[in-house]
Amino acid sequence: PALGFSVTSGMPLDYFPVLLGVGILMGLCGVLFCRMIFAFKRFFEWMKCSRFLKLVITFVTVAVIGFDSQLLLGGGNDLVGQLAFQSHGVLLLGGIVLGKILLTTFCYGSGAQGGIFLPMLVIGASAGAFCESLLSSMGLIAPDFVPQFVLCAMGGMLAAAMRTPILAILLVLEMTDSFSNIYAIGIVTIVAYLVAELLKEPPIYDSLLQAMTGQSNLENVQTFFQTKVPVVASYVDTQLQDLNLPEGTLIVSIRRNGTYIVPLNDVKLQ
């Protein structure tokens, strides 16, 4: 496996309701991660200093943090395996989640070279281990399913940030060769995806591409179509000016009893 570990045992069905909460948490983490990246980008743009000075500030910050918190440094591929098979305290895991989000977004926002895919996996793994440790300390679950929670949370984090739930599931399954957990990962991934959709956070890679090119990846395309007004429609006998049409929508012609009517604002649909 690409991440160096595999989980062959699945999660009991009794724990599946708990995964809904994990999915909500991962959706929030994904949205926070995306927004923090652009918050730090705006911060460094506001500083109006040279790129060299920005990198110096980033290096000094990372160096100071690294003296005390080595777990937050680097990509974190070794950390994922440690989180899955070693026991850690709730406070430490929560600190890793928040610290990794802040440090990764800070470095990326400064313009320093580095990716965000592997850090997203580490954030997800840390959040999954945090959820398992918290729930087991409260006596809600048995303390034997850390790897399963790590897998589920990684899928949720990718789905929330990238907005590709199916791809997120496949990536986690293939990188860990843990196909026995496909249903558990699917639940967390879909819930996290829905949370990010409800919060209207665009996919991180689409947003980064738009920021780099200065162009939106969505193009306005002119489309014509015809439709009939059902007799039982709620908007029958409603004036055109009172219709709640989507932005950019224009009614160009109305055909009634074989004749065409100019679509003025006071014309009623029949």
Go through the PLM ranges and name each one.
Residues 211-227:
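Membrane-cytosol interface motif
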Residues 200, 219-220, 268-269:
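Short alpha-helix boundary/capping motifs
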Residues 1-216:
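Alpha-helical transmembrane segments and immediately membrane-proximal extracytoplasmic
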Residues 70, 119, 165, 230, ...:
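Proline-rich low-complexity regions
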Residues 77, 181, 217-220, 244, ...:
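Detector for Asparagine
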Residues 231, 235-270:
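Cytosolic Rossmann-like ligand/nucleotide-binding regulatory domains
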Residues 21, 170-172, 226-228, 250-253:
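Structured core elements
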